[in-house]
Regions:
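N-terminal ligand-binding lobe of clamshell/alpha-beta domains
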Residues: 1-285
Length: 285
């Protein structure tokens, strides 16, 4: 059993999707292959995001539970281990680079005795990522980038300059307007300060959970003051979803940073990748 949708693409790439027997809130899963197994009854629903159904999990008796935890203590995991089911903590979310996170497929390679296959898959992803990064260096326009949106209490949340997302934008060779800020998480800024700095930004990438311009205006009518809004240069990854609403970007993206980087290059400098079709992002309408 795994506890994050980000683990599912790695299982599938290794040909081990049949090892998944249960998941917490299966609606989040977007993969067609695994959704077919859910519909066929091979993957049991084990509760929602707030509470894992430990009773159902214990009935399944999986060989192991692959989990993640934000600290060194997890009451549910301790209970599972006391019942004789090993809990293996996956630390991929701690990685600070796109390729570092993707490399965790090697972790699953060890578990399934498929180290050589996992190495081969990662090496291909790494080669493709670095090739895209080299292509991005041919960019001569260096467009300016805004990201994030107002999430709550009129505070705009956007990636800090040392964050995972900022690294993608750096490798795409664009001018992320907060690239020089400190921190590896998110910056919490006022709307006014963001408007002052990014009103004329060329592109607005990943505007939070919003999937349409109408939703943005409903949240805050002042979004219309951004040039990227006026020029239809907003791109979101929230519209490509599985049949139950799971966002493809959140599930597949950590395993395929090469595709995320190519998306960003295609958006900001489409002439550099003339034959590439966007995988995760879509132009917001």
């Amino acid at each position: 059993m795994v506890t994050s949708t980000t683990h599912i693409p790695m299982l599938e790439l290794l040909g081990e999707e049949k090892a998944l027997v249960g998941f917490q809130n299966t609606d989040y899963i977007s993969s067609t292959k695994t959704r077919n197994r859910i519909d066929a009854g091979f993957v049991k629903e084990l509760g929602n995001e707030a509470a894992l159904n430990t009773e159902s999990l214990l009935e399944l008796r999986p060989d192991a539970v692959i989990g993640f935890t934000m600290d060194n203590y997890n009451k549910t995991f301790n209970l599972i281990e006391k019942q004789g089911i090993p809990v293996i903590v996956n630390g991929d979310w701690r990685e600070e680079t796109p390729l570092g996170r993707a490399e965790w497929i090697k972790f699953f390679g060890v578990l399934f005795d498929k180290e050589r296959l996992a190495d081969s898959i990662f090496n291909t992803i790494e080669v493709d990522y670095l090739a895209a990064k080299r292509i991005a260096k041919e960019n001569t326009k260096y467009p300016s980038i805004l990201s994030g949106a107002i999430m709550r209490n009129d505070i705009w949340s956007l990636p800090a300059g040392e964050s995972f997302v900022s690294q993608f934008l750096l490798d795409a060779n664009v001018n992320y307007l907060w690239k020089d800020s400190k921190g590896k998480g998110s910056l919490q800024l006022s709307f006014e300060s963001v408007l002052d700095k990014a009103q004329h930004a060329d592109y607005w990438i990943a505007p939070g959970y919003f999937s349409s311009k109408a939703q943005l205006l409903e949240n805050n009518p002042h979004y219309k003051n951004f040039a990227a809004f006026k020029n239809n240069n907003i791109y979101t990854a929230s519209t490509k979803r599985g049949v139950k609403g799971g966002v493809v970007y959140y599930e597949l993206g950590p395993t395929r940073p090469d595709l995320i980087l190519q998306d960003l290059i295609k958006i900001t400098n489409p002439e550099l990748l003339p034959n590439y079709t966007l995988t995760f992002f879509e132009q917001m309408k």
